[in-house]
């Protein structure tokens, strides 16, 4: 089996609000909320989801927290921003600063302003409207 990740699904509290953040705030292209024809019930999840096609076939999906829990046969857990971060590499320090400002204007909470890190990168962190942690990175040694 070749190891690769095809879909990253983020559990969200408000699908419309999260859609607006990523589509309107960050500018990610999407068809919007799809799968609304699949109605859920107490034990079966609904199908409403948002998908963003990223590079190399990677999909970023947004799925209501309660529906993701049902789909995986789990209880809804407590959200934590320190479990993982998603990194986005850009081509310059100026792009880091611009994306951090754009995210903040769209409703993100900047948790760590962009600055030089001891290991040679320039990056900053923000939380999206559901608390998911993103790092925007310029690495002079990459691309």
Describe each region flagged by the PLM.
Residues 1-3, 143:
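Basic/polar N-terminal segments that are highly enriched at the extreme N-terminus
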Residues 5-13, 50-54, 73-143:
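Vicinal oxygen chelate
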Residues 9-60, 66-67:
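Core segments of cupin and vicinal oxygen chelate
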Residues 37-40, 67-74, 112, 143:
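A short, acidic/glycine-rich surface segment
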